[in-house]
Amino acid sequence: MECSRTAVALKRQRFYGLITMLFVLTSSSGAKAADNIIMGMAGLNFSFLPFQIAMEKRFYEKYDLSVKPVLMRAQAAIPALVSGDVDYDTHFGSLVRGAVSGLPLRVIFSTAEKQMFSLVVQPEIKSAENLKGKIIAISSFGGTQHLVTAGTLRAVGIDPDREVKMINVGNEAVRVEQLRSKQIHAAMINPPMSVMMKKEGFGLLLHAADYLDLPLTGLGATTKKLKENPEQAKRVVRALNESLQFIRANRKETIAIFARWLKIDTEIAADTYDVAVKVLSADGTATDKAIVASIEEAKDTGKIKGNFTPRDVSDFSLVRAILTESKQKK
């Protein structure tokens, strides 16, 4: 009798175990696993807010994406992108320079139509003429920040090679510290730090957006990624496009997220938003004129020869497809 009861109990255990296993298998097959993506990030400022908004508002999750942002310098990010260690990258200028240098890269999304840099100067510098003979800090020679600084100076009649002394000091935090300690006279700084520096008494002498039609931030991928997994790339672009629209339509919440993200005062975040939102891309694309300007900027390094078209460095077909689909739904 006891053996019979034991046998029945074992059968029940096997039955319920089988049911449990079938339930787990059914649930697993029904749930779509999110794509794990590594994204190279160029910085932490307003121009990268669309990427942070996509995280906080779960736009990535909405499209089955698990994105890990990694802060990287362009010198490391571009090789990592080409090798496949990084899936997507945000160094717009470096992506363009890489493409015209022969690397298999394309810009597929633009978050900012123009540069947000302001030339932050010591209080005694009141005009472009006052910059002559002064020390201007840059992040690295040949990088976007260097080329933007040089282009802006040329636009106001200053020869960046002869009339000022440019020194390579590193990232924005270092440039800010050297401004505060008076080791340098000027440096291009992005918001919100440029806004904070103004409140500290520094001058904002020149704004790059007033002189240069250069896109600031965007997203790029390898041609291999776009060929082998266009569906994933489209989901990434779709999430970022929703993020752009959210930022424009939700000022108060965007400011709150921005302030929390960078741990800055809400007033600073609001001032930054009101200035910087004006140069955000309207729909994730960049004009041919802007892309050509980026190509010319790349050629200014003197290392790149030849003629290139916007199609050689960018591919906004995914964005345009999404925009067309959105119009058809309305």
Question: Which functions belong to the PLM regions below?
Answer:
Residues 2-18:
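Bacterial N-terminal signal peptides that target proteins for export
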Residues 144-162, 239-271, 310-312, 322-323, ...:
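Ligand-binding clefts/hinges and TM-proximal coupling segments of bilobed small-molecule sensing domains
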Residues 29-33:
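Sec/Tat signal peptide C-region and signal peptidase I cleavage site
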Residues 228-305:
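Secondary-structure end/capping motifs
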Residues 296-330:
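Conserved C-terminal helix/tail region of periplasmic/extracytoplasmic solute-binding proteins
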